[in-house]
Amino acid sequence: MAMEDIVGIIFEDIEEVKPILSDSEGNDLEGNDLSEAILEYGISEGKFLCVDYGGEEGSEIINYIMDYEFSHGIELATQEELEELDEMEYDDLTDKIKEVNKILEKAGYGLFCFPTGSDFYELFIAKLEDKEKLLEEKIVDDEELPLEERYIQYYV
């Protein structure tokens, strides 16, 4: 699968993001340049939630889910489920992400982690029907990163 396909899944409208797929001279971006452009665009457009590995400040993940629900006109979790997630105590952020995914999967969605090679998780919501496509493409080409951290992650 090409990165353009992954971009289309993450951002849902490939026409919207075509400008980030090339440089100012019209040359297609590749490798780490492309993944960096995707990250920057995703953050600027609110498609990615940037969370420190140390954990959330406040209710960042819950607010992100609620914003996604509002902008897409869908319900991914009940108010009760969101409140339980908000009150959850955890030592590792991936533990909370796993709990979020247990809830979102009921609606056919998941919370995925875009690789960064930094001290932050870049999270995004996508349909589970696209899970295999999202997980198969190497996103970051950095030999210093463990192999699994070069791919989009889905924690269960």
Predicted features along the sequence, with ranges:
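Contiguous interface-forming segments/domains that mediate binding rather than catalysis
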Residues: 1-156
